[in-house]
Amino acid sequence: MASYNDYKEYKNKNHETMVFVKSGVFYETYDNDCKIMLDLFDYQIKNFKNFSRTGFPANNIDKVKEKLTEKQINYIIVENNIYQI
């Protein structure tokens, strides 16, 4: 749940920016950002009672960043509660 809390913290400050949170060897994103990942990469969405989540292996991050940049979608990557744009 810490990943989701980190996501919400950064998303509240950056409404129009996708937020990815590193969790172990995966990156996760939540809620409406999941729909973008579904459209671009066909990643499955897991629906929970209060939120939705999708994730991908950390070794795919360069592919994801390249596609988001190509589509002119802003994003933030959060690792260890430190973010990079």
Residue ranges and their predicted role:
Residues M1-I85:
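Basic, polar low-complexity surface loops/patches
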